[in-house]
Amino acid sequence: MTIKLINIGFGNIISANRMISIVSPESAPIKRMIQDARDRGMLIDATYGRRTRAVVVMDSDHIILSAVQPETVAHRLSVKEEIMDEGQG
């Protein structure tokens, strides 16, 4: 298994293999999930003080806040997978 890394903005890179989901921070359940992670010390804020636009849920129970749109993160992931597939063929 190869390690896939993905840029979530401002030079911050996470392991794509360990991502569970990328969601918008607007809904009340996601806001509660962010607050719970903050209380447990499992929140990683990668926004550099900017507005949170994407919430990345990791398999380690960490929650990562990003200032990049969820669609942008997903697009970067899909482009990365396409490049990897072309390299194997």
Swiss-Prot record:
It comes from the Bacteria. GO terms for molecular function: DNA binding. Signal peptide: none annotated. Transmembrane segments: none annotated. Keywords: DNA-binding, Transcription, Transcription regulation. InterPro entries: RemA-like. The keyword Ribonucleoprotein does not apply. Disruption phenotype: Mutation impairs pellicle formation, complex colony architecture and motility inhibition in a sinR mutant background. Mutant is defective in biofilm formation and also shows a delay in spore formation during biofilm formation. Regulates the biosynthesis of the extracellular matrix and the biofilm formation. Activates the transcription of the matrix biosynthesis operons eps and tapA-sipW-tasA. Also activates expression of the opuA operon, involved in osmoprotection. Acts by binding specifically to the promoter region of the target genes. Acts in parallel to the pathway that governs SinR derepression. Required for endosporulation. Belongs to the RemA family. This is Extracellular matrix regulatory protein A. It comes from Bacillus subtilis (strain 168).
